[in-house]
């Protein structure tokens, strides 16, 4: 089971998280842009709808729609990329609100100081605002990643041979449910414990620079 956790569970969580984070940053940036024109307003409305739908529906339903629904329109994916897409879309919706809140939390004086030294909006955002916003969002994003590690067990329902799927296969053969599932739970806990420790260290290190 440890091999499955290393080869499938962790890569699934890591790839999904960073793809989701990319989606989150794009959505958050769009939602925080000034909206003087109709196309941008429509794009912002679309982002709000995306967040509302994803946050308002179970992840399992989202996984099933992608895995079983896409083949109906001629798109067939393997289980692993299906899980990555589903997790990334889900993470993107939740993390987008985290990143957006962090951007809004940056004092307006930071914008004004950037403009005062000759930066335009894009330069101020990339060089001054976004680094601080990501630093502020580290605790919430770290918790999202830890939750993603645990949520990868849902991928077993679309036949991804990650940790929980392997545990199911073993129990189907020997019926040692308590032993096998306890071992799986222990592996999940060890991963999350290590990640929580690293999160604490990272927060302490970042706090020195705030």
UniProtKB/Swiss-Prot annotation:
What region holds the ABC transmembrane type-1 domain?
A: 6-199
On whether DNA damage is a keyword of this UniProt record, the answer is no
Any stretches that span the bilayer, and where are they? 10-30, 57-77, 79-99, 177-197
Q: How does it sit in the membrane?
A: Multi-pass membrane protein
Q: Which UniProt keywords apply?
A: Amino-acid transport, Cell inner membrane, Cell membrane, Membrane, Transmembrane, Transmembrane helix, Transport
Q: Where in the cell is it found?
A: Cell inner membrane
**Which Gene3D superfamilies does the protein's record reference?**
MetI-like (1.10.3720.10)
Q: What's a Pfam family this protein contains?
A: BPD_transp_1
The entry's function note states: Probably part of a binding-protein-dependent transport system for an amino acid. Probably responsible for the translocation of the substrate across the membrane.
What name has this protein been given in UniProt?
Probable amino-acid ABC transporter permease protein HI_0179
Q: Which organism is it from?
A: Haemophilus influenzae (strain ATCC 51907 / DSM 11121 / KW20 / Rd)
